[in-house]
């Protein structure tokens, strides 16, 4: 094949009626642009390697995006993906297993514990089950998400979030064609064919859309040599299909009065859940 396939790791969230839904600002919904591309504002694409830490990578990407956009903290700060991956598995009681995690739990972890820098807790996949040092948690408290909301399975809300200038994290079902040389070269992912086999679940970050092609622009965590310099596109139909994508979340580090994101201190922020 010529390209070594990385790992996946998205586990679907359990239903929770307490999830607060994102509400895109009405003025933006009334005049949605035909396309949005946040890639120029994104941090460098990560590479998760052979570890099922895609949720930690996706959440870290959204977190770093927000810090850059809102000009918070040091410019050389890169969030520790392994810190997020460990703490989301603490919530789920699976720290000793590399079986992935739920996006909601990963976001709850950066609300409660925050996230230290990768300089403090590096991305060494052999240490995935090791608890970060006390200093990492102390640093994490200085870098916490303030609010988070679930984005509805609605094209206007998804587009509205992106048009507002913020990405959203989500998970999708991966089929065989995603691992093909063609996708690795072009970054163009089509709807799965009837006889394709499911190979896993993957968490990624939506960073744009284009009405002309009816596709979302997605940030992956397989390095810059894969796809379109680390990005790929998915049809609108992929994200609105209940069998193909789920768990759409957007986070904020500074409260935005223009939309009703959930306060981090709200109910259930630390409740334990088990994976499906």
Model-inferred region functions:
Residues 2-8, 29-34, 40, 60-64, ...:
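Predominantly the structural core of cysteine protease catalytic domains
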Residues 17-35:
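Short N-terminal secondary-structure initiator segments
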Residues 35-50:
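Asp/Glu-centered strand-loop micro-motifs enriched in Gly/Pro and often flanked by an aromatic residue
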């Amino acid at each position: 094949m010529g390209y070594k396939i990385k790992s996946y790791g998205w586990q679907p969230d359990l239903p929770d009626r307490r999830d607060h839904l994102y509400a895109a600002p009405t003025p933006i919904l009334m005049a949605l642009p035909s396309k949005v591309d946040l890639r120029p504002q994104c941090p460098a694409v990560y590479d998760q390697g052979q570890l099922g830490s895609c949720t930690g990578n996706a959440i870290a990407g959204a977190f770093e995006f927000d810090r850059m956009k809102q000009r918070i903290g040091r410019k050389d700060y890169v969030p520790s993906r392994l810190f997020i991956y460990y703490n989301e598995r603490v919530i789920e009681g699976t720290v000793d297993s590399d079986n992935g995690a739920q996006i909601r739990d990963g976001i709850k972890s950066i609300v409660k514990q925050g996230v230290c820098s990768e300089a403090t807790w590096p991305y060494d996949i052999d240490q995935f089950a090791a608890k970060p040092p006390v200093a990492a948690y102390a640093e994490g408290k200085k870098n916490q998400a303030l609010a988070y909301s679930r984005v509805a399975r609605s094209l206007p809300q998804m587009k509205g979030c992106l048009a507002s200038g913020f990405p959203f994290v989500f998970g999708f079902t991966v089929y065989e064609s995603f691992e093909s040389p063609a996708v690795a070269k072009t970054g163009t992912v089509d709807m799965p064919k009837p006889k394709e086999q499911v190979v896993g679940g993957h968490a990624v970050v939506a960073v744009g859309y284009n009405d002309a092609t009816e596709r979302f622009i997605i940030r992956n965590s397989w390095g810059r040599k894969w796809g379109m310099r680390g990005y790929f596109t998915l049809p609108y139909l992929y994200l609105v299909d209940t069998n193909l994508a789920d768990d759409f979340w957007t986070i904020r580090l500074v409260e935005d009065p223009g939309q009703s994101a959930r306060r981090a201190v709200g109910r259930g922020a630390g409740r334990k859940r088990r994976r499906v």
